[in-house]
Curated annotation (Swiss-Prot):
<feature type="transmembrane region" description="Helical">
    <location>
        <begin position="43"/>
        <end position="63"/>
    </location>
</feature>
<keyword id="KW-0808">Transferase</keyword>
<dbReference type="GO" id="GO:0008818">
    <property type="term" value="F:cobalamin 5'-phosphate synthase activity"/>
</dbReference>
<keyword id="KW-0460">Magnesium</keyword>
<comment type="function">
    <text>Joins adenosylcobinamide-GDP and alpha-ribazole to generate adenosylcobalamin (Ado-cobalamin). Also synthesizes adenosylcobalamin 5'-phosphate from adenosylcobinamide-GDP and alpha-ribazole 5'-phosphate.</text>
</comment>
<feature type="transmembrane region" description="Helical">
    <location>
        <begin position="141"/>
        <end position="161"/>
    </location>
</feature>
<comment type="similarity">
    <text>Belongs to the CobS family.</text>
</comment>
<dbReference type="GO" id="GO:0051073">
    <property type="term" value="F:adenosylcobinamide-GDP ribazoletransferase activity"/>
</dbReference>
<keyword id="KW-0169">Cobalamin biosynthesis</keyword>
<keyword id="KW-1133">Transmembrane helix</keyword>
<keyword id="KW-0997">Cell inner membrane</keyword>
<keyword id="KW-0472">Membrane</keyword>
<dbReference type="Pfam" id="PF02654">
    <property type="entry name" value="CobS"/>
</dbReference>
<dbReference type="InterPro" id="IPR003805">
    <property type="entry name" value="CobS"/>
</dbReference>
<keyword id="KW-1003">Cell membrane</keyword>
<feature type="transmembrane region" description="Helical">
    <location>
        <begin position="185"/>
        <end position="205"/>
    </location>
</feature>
<feature type="transmembrane region" description="Helical">
    <location>
        <begin position="116"/>
        <end position="136"/>
    </location>
</feature>
Amino acid sequence: MTLTAFVDDLARSLGFLSRLPIASRFFQNHSGEMSRTPRAFPLAGAVITAPAGLLLALMLGLGASSMVAAFAAIGLQVLLTGALHEDGFADTADGLGGANRERALDIMKDSRVGTFGVLALVFGVGLRVAALASLVNSLSPINVALVMIGIAAVSRALMVWHWHALPPAKPDGVAASLGKPEDNTLYTALFLGLAVAVVTIAPVTSFHPLAVMLVASGAAAFASNRLVSHRLGGQTGDTIGATQQICEITALASIAMAL
């Protein structure tokens, strides 16, 4: 793995996961195939979330309430990602409400958001905001920002696991057209997710909250893998995004409870 190749993958990951402007040269002569690129997802997640963490710290420093600052931070995250993961979360929630596999996949292709999708977004955003506001009571503003960055890396690593662990549910779907992460891609993503979490979270909390967060988010990803495999027979672009959201929500809630 050369540094230049990894920087290219990081830039492509940022372009794939966010609305950040990325130079077109990183996509020239690239087929769009994603067997290697997701290894940089954890670092991309950290970069994407850093502005939201800094906004949270700034607003708290200027006297904003924890709830207002948390809402603003989550709102900026959504803007920076173009609600990519939230869209997948809502579509997956709607789809899993379907009576069978075929109906579920049809529902997930529908651009309209149903009742389950709306409820998933309400509860998902609400839990993230509440957990962030709770963290403010235990940590300094800048330390909460660091926790956000670490969790962003972990949740992106676990979405790579979901992508790698399951076959495509639809042979003509977006996930199938992009290819599947290689074994080394998964191992690198998991290592980077863990490394970023250790560097950002361990120094500002302790080993116990970090361990609780890692175990809880890993268990959430495992449960997501099993549920999606059972109901849909494989992953889609929507379930990959949903797994990221499930893991982020679980990570924020678990570390807030552990502190």
